[in-house]
Amino acid sequence: MITNTILDVFARNLQELRKERGLSQEQLAARAGVHRTYIGMIERSEKNITLLNMEKIAIALNVDIIDLLKR
């Protein structure tokens, strides 16, 4: 049985990578071209992120999308 959904995994990885880079949610949102509240909702697993926005966030963090999906 899988205890964490893919949204939870993405949320955890996003928050960890963002903090490692010393970025606020607002700074990351500006780099990715999305709204700050959207980043917050993703980090709380409240939003089902699209592939296009996954790509924007990965580029903004300078990582591969797969790094955001690793369990």
What are these regions (language model features)?
Residues M1-V9:
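A detector for short, charged/polar N-terminal pre-domain segments
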Residues R12-Q27, R31:
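Short basic helix-loop element that most often maps to the first helix and adjoining turn
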Residues L14, L28-A29, I39-I42, L68:
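Conserved hydrophobic/aromatic packing and binding residues within compact polymer-binding modules
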Residues V34-K47:
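Recognition helix of helix-turn-helix/homeodomain-like DNA-binding domains
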Residues E43, N53, L61:
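DNA major-groove recognition helix of helix-turn-helix
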Residues E46-K56:
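Short, basic-rich loop-to-helix N-cap that marks the start of a DNA-contacting helix
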Residues N62-R71:
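Short C-terminal boundary/hinge segments that cap the last helix of small helical domains
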